């Protein structure tokens, strides 16, 4: 039986090899045909292909693009000729050829631009890593070898891999390697940095000082770029307040006024059509909010993003697991809170079904409460995770400072970690104690920091952990590396505080527009609408009141989510704003405006 199985596997592998050879030969023949039909070569395009990291040259790539465009154009021509007529077929042929050529030519430019963006976003943080390791007098090639293993640095990690390949595989010297990468890299900023490094190497400057100066300059540049991004977001925020705050108010005020005038003059009016209200609240506000969130998410950089996912939240409700083995289930506070809210949810659904009214709350109110209480544990848990990760970020600089001071006093890193484990670092305390215990048991320090890098959700924490891990592996002067990391952590913390301070004003503006909406609703329901709708048949104050109430709920949800994206680049961060606006808006409408 085993022999039969081995034969089956070997036959299967032979078939795979034959298939691969067949497709490889077919691909080669296709390339040869394209190059024979179209002899095109462009040096500038060769440069773009190189910067995009595509293993191709213009004399091969462009002919393949042109031949592919003609083949696809002919296929479209035949299909359109059968389905439509000769006019559509010719149009499809020309259009198909043009679109394929356009995509084929633009693709390397887009790829190069994406690579440049990834490099520029990670450049200052990669040089924080390089500067920290160079402070321990680690050779330049070894520093870039360490950087090449850290995927969290995105495009810079790939650049480091290319440098390592050139020096260790192709045996280029370090100066030739940097000069070559300066010409090839798609990032103009990195190209300039490479030339600075080469100049420093030629004159024999001390590299740790050069790397530190480059890091300082790059951090200042990144800070300016972040502030420029915030300025763009500030402009978008002003448009958002107008689009989702002022325009709905304008529609709400205009429709009854226009309806009243139309009734008096006995003429139809577009602005007096009540259908504008559902269009405004159900379409305009959600679409405008989603567009705003998409634009802000695209503009704001990922420098301080917290990767809190739904999977992390669901783990809180699951049985604990260690290396695939299910442990005994233990009740946690989150389980009791969930049970409490679900009991409230069941009571709310029961009140809805028996049509019971309590105070000013009716059937539909209890239905909404039931749904809210059902999902509230997951919402609150996800936000709790977000708060914990945010607080851990704030304590990292303090922890690193204490660790550095302990090491500088003469302790080794294991003893220093045990001393730090006695200090209170808020949510970070548990992690510090865990690391100290693992180190005291004899686990390698680099493995402990590697675990920290893998488990942390914050990019800031991951970058710090990556430097600490390499610090343990490199065997350099730990004191200098820790000092460099601590300074870097404080700089990041300060930068994040400055950005948050600038964004706070727009949080206030969006809240003001929310309360303005509630205030306007109160005036309309109690003063304006009863007078205007007195002589209009088919429309009542209750009709407008329902739309105003729904408008508050919709505005609360989308404005809260927008604030989360605006402040922390995460909808989870907007949960507190959503809940606050929903509760305040709901209660004010029910008890003061009338629901």
Swiss-Prot record:
It is a multi-pass membrane protein. Keywords: Cell membrane, Membrane, Transmembrane, Transmembrane helix. One of its GO terms (cellular component) is plasma membrane. InterPro entries: ArlJ-like, T2SS_GspF_dom, T2SS_GspF_sf. It is found in: Cell membrane. Pfam families: T2SSF (PF00482). The chain crosses the membrane at residues 64-84, 86-106, 239-259, 281-301, 334-354, 368-388, 504-524, 547-567, 571-591. It comes from the Archaea. To M.jannaschii FlaJ. PANTHER family: INTEGRAL MEMBRANE PROTEIN-RELATED, TYPE II SECRETION SYSTEM PROTEIN GSPF DOMAIN-CONTAINING PROTEIN. This is Uncharacterized protein MJ1286. It comes from Methanocaldococcus jannaschii (strain ATCC 43067 / DSM 2661 / JAL-1 / JCM 10045 / NBRC 100440) (Methanococcus jannaschii).
